[in-house]
Amino acid sequence: MLVSYRWLGEYVDLTGITAKELAERITKSGIEVERVEALDRGMKGVVIGHVLECEPHPNADKLRKCLVDLGEDEPVQIICGAPNVAKGQKVAVAKVGAVLPGNFKIKRAKLRGEESNGMICSLQELGVETKVVPKEYADGIFVFPSDAPIGADAIEWLGLHDEVLELSLTPNRADCLSMIGVAYEVAAILGRDVKLPEAAVKENSEHVHEYISVRVEAPEDNPLYAGRIVKNVRIGPSPLWMQARLMAAGIRPHNNVVDITNYILLEYGQPLHAFDYDRLGSKEIVVRRAKAGETIITLDDVERKLTEEHLVITNGREPVALAGVMGGANSEVRDDTTTVFIEAAYFTSPVIRQAVKDHGLRSEASTRFEKGIDPARTKEALERAAALMSEYAGGEVVGGIVEASVWRQDSVVVTVTLERINGVLGTAMSKEEVAAILSNLQFPFTEDNGTFTIHVPSRRRDIAIEEDIIEEVARLYGYDRLPATLPVAEAKPGGLTPYQAKRRRVRRYLEGAGLFQAITYSLTSPDKATRFALETAEPIRLALPMSEERSVLRQSLIPHLLEAASYNRARQVENVALYEIGSVYLSKGEHVQPAENERLAGVLTGLWHAHLWQGEKKAADFYVAKGILDGLFDLFGLAARIEYKPAKRADLHPGRTAEIALGGKVIGFVGQLHPAVQKEYDLKETYVFELALTDLLNAESEAIRYEPIPRFPSVVRDIALVVDENVEAGALKQAIEEAGKPLVKDVSLFDVYKGDRLPDGKKSLAFSLRYYDPERTLTDEEVAAVHERVLAAVEKQFGAVLRG
């Protein structure tokens, strides 16, 4: 928001405070002033001159030789290259010795043999940005009104002896998107009164209903619509002081009618739109949602396709404006306009925001509607605009306002106690001090025994709860005056929760095992969201995703780890071992908070042991991945309760995948990627695992039992059992352990064989069995008896026979 210091002074007394001092006070109150800029930029010696004569330069086709009266004894000759310079004009002249922006000094000179004693200036040469210069003067010099006094200070007449404060407003302070709103803020800071502009309208004897009617078919989008008719207007330039204020605020002047609507926008923060009444094509205004397939050509001459999500102003048949955003070319004010319909409305933020997004049209008006205006001042702004059009466009205001409204002013009442204010701020303010601050803010209130009941003005949409009032009191009291105190509390050393400590042990173990930690996106694409997931649910979609690739929340960590492995392999890093600890997100139904579960996942591809001087290279395989997990389970005393069960999972190799169960509950899986998936990610043989980390770390560990060092020798027997190919080694091992109790202490698989020496559909599993009794030395007969019992048990359960 650009705020003219001189213009602001019309609403609040700024005596005794400079623009820079005011900027500092505003910043201290919580609204940042990014810069203070002097519009005159140090210029001096620029006066209003009268072009007495203007003739072609004898030696240059594009130059003019002008005789200019500067209000001095004799007129001076000035050579000018502007295409629009002409006899009789009042122009800005930089005299010899004048200083223009950039410390450019004007000197007497000869141009193509003719003497030039000064410079006739364009607005750009006086420091005005091209984008705000009126179009008729964009490529030439500026021409003053005919009543401008010769020899007067041109900078003063152009309103450039002013300073502009640029406010950086947070979204909650939409009230300061107007000069009056800023005036209320400054008045509160300085403890002064606000002087509001007069909006008295002189009406004729006619009534507006003879000209037009209004019907709103979408009151939820447009709670308030009002309008006035001004007839017999004469389109022309607006007064110079108004043009100067518009340009200082970054708005290009057009004509008196359009400039007045923009002036009210800046003054009240209320967007207005002026229609050429005779071009509306009917005597009614209908506000409704657009119909599918409708189009409108807006003021920028672009045809825009409309949908049912857009709000339009129509003449009962076709759109004449995209509500709150831009008017239509079919009803714009032109040089021959004589009757104007002024629209003042309150459009709700969502419908305006949708139109801005769909059409890429953001304007000063739409910005204010998006952030919220004060509907209580809508008709006041309309009256002010009608009064100005009567004064500066020669218009005749038709009696009455046409209106359609369902808006009702809801008074926001907030109660807060003095004790609460002082308790939050750490101050010792009195009731009188708080009352003075609320009075400066112009918040109506009552006070009863230290309890303040505040009726929040409609302009302050950001005030709703007691904390908002406390913040306002703190701002005006002065943040720099709040006492600085150290917290009064017992200092205690920090620490980790048991769960956090376990998670840290997991990281240390995996990194010690040779894996590197990865951190990947929580967002993924819909087609990858449920791949590899332990549990699946309807993917949770973002309301406004940046792209489809990052539009839903993940349900597994593996897809992004595979992308990381593929990324590394594409850059010649063939051996990859990564793990990630992160959250996955599962929908629990509509209006229910989604579940956020922590997972541990890993990916292994390439060599596990590479370039070992003492041994051969070893590729990552199923047993490497399983061994890493076994070590993790053993770390937390869970190994005895873990079971690996063959499983078939989508995207994994059907014969090299196992589900992992803890106490009968599946908590994860480990396996090789399906060859098709390996090809999809451009990976060689790759192994992955994923665990429900929360279940793992919350599981109760087995108590560690002391066993003395063996005093007696153990006996080791090896057996090779021929079984069907579908028999699981784990199941066979468990049967051996059960049948061999209590003497069989350890069973380990050391060989698997399939080949020509075995019948079709058979395989050989070789186990090593260790027999031991802590109380005595076992005899061969005792071991043989138990060994026979083991063989009988596996034969009965699995049809296993000793391999010959």
Swiss-Prot record:
The keyword Nucleotide-binding applies. Residues 409-484 form the B5 domain. Mg(2+) binds at D462, D468, E471, E472. Binds 2 magnesium ions per tetramer. It is found in: Cytoplasm. GO terms for biological process: phenylalanyl-tRNA aminoacylation. InterPro entries: aa-tRNA-synth_II/BPL/LPL, B3/B4_tRNA-bd, DNA-bd_dom_put_sf, Fdx_antiC-bd, Fdx_antiC-bd_sf, NA-bd_OB-fold, Phe-tRNA-ligase_IIc_bsu, Phe-tRNA-ligase_IIc_bsu_bact. This is Phenylalanine--tRNA ligase beta subunit.
